[in-house]
Curated annotation (Swiss-Prot):
A GO MF label: manganese ion binding
Gene Ontology terms describing biological process: proteolysis
Record gene name: PEPP
Free-text comment on the cofactor: Binds 2 manganese ions per subunit.
InterPro entries: Aminopep_P_N (IPR007865), Creatin/AminoP/Spt16_N (IPR029149), Creatinase/aminopeptidase-like (IPR036005), Pept_M24 (IPR000994), X-Pro_dipept-like (IPR052433)
Name this protein carries in UniProt: Probable Xaa-Pro aminopeptidase PEPP
Function: Catalyzes the removal of a penultimate prolyl residue from the N-termini of peptides.
Record-listed E.C. numbers: 3.4.11.9
Cofactor(s) needed by this chain: Mn(2+)
Domain of life: Eukaryota
Binding site for Mn(2+) 1: D275, E398, E438
PANTHER family tied to this protein: XAA-PRO AMINOPEPTIDASE 3, XAA-PRO DIPEPTIDASE
Length: 468
């Protein structure tokens, strides 16, 4: 019988398992089987020229080994003794007046998967005690994440190089608890996308739909967004990471309602991210040109998903998506030539300029992708994930086709490349802006598990958009 998300998340975040995993990776990288792992949580920071606090975001590697979201905290992991300790801020009477009582040591020990909880005032003493008991072994830390008052003087060796790499490589493969967190983030985000579909026809401005999305996420338990949401109407959708989210949905020049809204948005649930993109017609029905492009992008995604399993080279999946785009644009008459010629010339990059996807976890663009931004092939330059897919890794699959004049015009004006694009046919598609469809999937040995439940068939989206 399958364990439900609720059952899984009723347990503790598996910090101890993660600490062991990172320690094992340190050993695999040739740095020994003993020593202390030392990490600091994010500090409380103040807004410049203000007495207000900056929004807090816990350091991801610290959270991975602690499960602790508290600011100004620390951790140590004694590799040989297999002892994980977190240090949390003590009670400050002056702060209690304003903020209430903080978490106690006893409460923290009940909540977190650790062996001991101490006050942050005891960090240096604890480190010194370890050195005394173990003969001054090695400490592993991240160079720019050690507070000035922390002293490693008693240690024989300080390693600032391997810990960050070991933690980030360990984070690529998710355990069942992490997948449950990602699944919950996707469930909540998918419902919020549906709420936007249902409001699309009546909305007057991009920000209204953003507010509906964020409100739906918050009411379901996600206070934070994984990234700044993208609510791009009409031709704004040709900008990949459009940020304004504040334009009217009726064009001020033509008086016409814009065709579509591209929604790239995902909630963060207990530090784990969803990253979902959908497109909804603002009239309730896709225009013929919009539907043609949508169908191509959906085929790009379906073809990519069909290839996914552990060990498959991500570059091959990405290339397949480009080929599907080429075939679709040839059929519409936007492109001219043969599939092979267009692929080799990189013409599809004019319409699909970004990578197919990336790893997902506590960061939207999660660790382990090994991108190569120096790649001279424009098809692969912005591919954030390279190499074979890892079983248990979580990836986004997000093909798209865009009609961005800034990108396409140089192709049109090129003596070598312009002949492959039919400018007359292309002219009918500028108003589509862009279409992207993005799901989050767990890579398995024999395929994938799609965490994203937001509808993506065009008929389903149109039905939701026109519901009364």
């Amino acid at each position: 019988m399958a364990v439900s998300v609720d059952q899984t998340l009723a347990g503790k975040y598996p910090a101890k398992l993660h600490a062991k995993r990172v320690a094992a990776r340190i050993q695999e990288l040739g740095h020994g089987d003993s020593g202390i792992i030392y990490l600091e949580g994010q500090k409380t920071h103040m807004i410049e020229d203000s007495d207000g606090e900056m929004p807090f975001r816990q350091r991801r590697n610290f959270f991975y080994l602690s499960g602790c979201p508290l600011p100004d905290s620390y951790l140590t992991y004694d590799i040989k003794a297999d002892k994980l300790t977190i240090f949390i801020p003590p009670i400050d009477p002056a702060s209690v007046i304003w903020s209430g009582l903080p978490l106690s040591v006893e409460e923290a020990l009940e909540i977190y998967d650790v062996d001991a909880v101490l006050s942050t005032a005891e960090v240096n003493a604890s480190l010194a005690h370890y050195c005394s008991a173990q003969g001054g072994k090695k400490v592993f830390a991240i160079a720019d994440q050690v507070s000035p008052h922390i002293t490693f003087l008693p240690f024989q060796e300080i390693d600032f190089d391997v810990l960050k790499r070991a933690a980030e490589e360990s984070r690529v493969v998710k355990d069942s608890y992490e997948i449950a967190l990602l699944r919950r983030a996707n469930e909540i985000s998918s419902k919020a996308h549906v709420a936007v579909f249902k409001a699309a026809m009546s909305a007057r401005n991009e920000r209204e739909l953003e507010a509906i999305f964020v409100g739906a996420c918050m009411s379901s338990g996600c206070r934070e967004q994984s990234y700044h949401p993208i609510f791009a109407s009409g031709t704004n959708a040709a900008t990949l990471h459009y940020q304004k989210n504040d334009e009217d949905l009726v064009d001020s020049v033509t008086g016409q309602r814009r065709l579509n809204m591209l929604i790239d948005a995902g909630a963060e649930y207990r530090n784990y991210c969803a990253d979902i993109t959908r497109v909804v017609p603002l009239s309730g029905k896709f225009s013929p040109e919009s539907r043609q492009i949508y169908d191509i992008v959906l085929e790009m995604q379906n073809s990519s998903l069909a290839m996914i399993k552990a060990g498959v080279m991500w570059e091959d999946v990405h290339s397949t998506s480009h080929r599907v785009a080429i075939r679709g644009l040839l059929k519409l008459g936007i492109l001219r030539g043969t599939e092979e010629e267009l692929f080799e010339k990189g013409i599809s990059v004019a319409f699909f300029p970004h990578g197919l996807g990336h790893y997902l976890g506590m960061d939207t663009h999660d660790t382990g992708g090994n991108p190569n931004y120096a790649d001279k092939d424009p098809k692969f330059k912005y591919l954030r994930l390279r190499g074979p897919l890892a079983s248990g890794g979580v990836v986004t699959v997000e093909p798209g086709i865009y009609f961005c004049r800034f990108i396409i015009d140089p192709y049109l004006s090129s003596p070598d490349l312009g002949k492959y694009i039919n400018a007359d046919v292309l002219g009918r598609y500028w108003s589509v802006g862009g279409v992207r469809i993005e799901d989050n999937v767990v890579v398995t040995d024999n395929g994938y598990d799609n965490l994203t439940t937001a509808p993506k068939l065009p008929e389903e989206i149109e039905k939701l958009a026109t519901e009364k």
